[in-house]
Amino acid sequence: MIIINIYIFTKRKLNFIEELKLKLKILNLRVISNDLNKKIKKVALINGSAMSYWRKAKKESDLFITGDVGYHDALDALESGFNVIDFGHYESEHFFYEILIEELKDKNLEFLIFNRGPVFKFY
């Protein structure tokens, strides 16, 4: 079962995108949108590669944040008028293992982390 987190507020998409980049210390986000000045009220978030859920997210939100958005999925969302932010697969998931390690550090466990950074570099 996939849980879609819904966040409710009112902001212009462009303002939200800039705030998100600052808070998460990310230089670039891939944005699929017909109108960046339109206000959003609900944001849906699923980490990792979750574009297969964009139609469900569209029913419940104005903006969907996920990772690994493929070209044809992005085109379908754009043509339907839905707004998507592609956060990147690694970028949307690395917080999880950092939190998990912090929570379990006192359990005398050894952690093997195979992916310590994003695979793709942007220049």
PLM segments and residue spans:
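Active-site catalytic microenvironments in core metabolic enzymes, especially phosphate/sugar-handling
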Residues: M1-Y123
